[in-house]
Amino acid sequence: GGLYEHYQDNMQNPTFSLGIYTFSDVRAFLENRPLRFLGLGPEGAIDRYWRFDLLGAFVQDAWAVTPRLTLNLGLRYETSTMPIEKYGRDSALPDLLAPAPTTGRLYSNPPRRNFSPRFGFAWDPTGRGRMSIRGGYGWFINTNNQQNLIVTVTNPPATPRFVITNNVTFPNPPFERGVGNTMRPIEWNIMNPSLHMWNLNVQRQAPGQIVLTLGYAGARGVHLMRNTDINIPAPAR
């Protein structure tokens, strides 16, 4: 079998235009004395229009090795193209020490080694149809990770998000005193998240139309996505 999907992710989210005020304590909050403001400037764009494709293929077969043993074998491959913003407003940070982000693409290249095998079996050890042992293993790769694009909407230069720390006013912050920009880039050498799953079950038919089952299932995730702050200051002692 095969798969082809073309995606148009048209996003316009006014939530990104909301700012965040920080107060030093409850009294400062009640007296309307903000300590810090983080938010978009008046010209910040809150829309993005991404385009990308998802392609895949798979083979699968059930093989009756003997009347008592059946194998299920499969292999799947999927890949996605680089998400491209219609107006070229994507930006990235390949080098964490770089003074400014690069524009035009979000990360280096989509990973291509996305072969994911499947294996399963069903075995009747006695040949009397009263007991079965079943098991399987699968490697599942998530190649459609474009939900992470949303975190890049507030990245400069298209959508600068300013930090204001001096003489912050409410409700109209002084953007002309904004110091620097914040950025939420995607890992430049990104890897696709994957999940290894396996299970083993033993079933036994008991008298009175009762079936006893003992099973074990496990899973292990690799390269799972998460948000992390790479610029956390060292805790004071």
Residue ranges of model-derived segments:
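Short acidic-glycine motifs
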Residues: 1-237
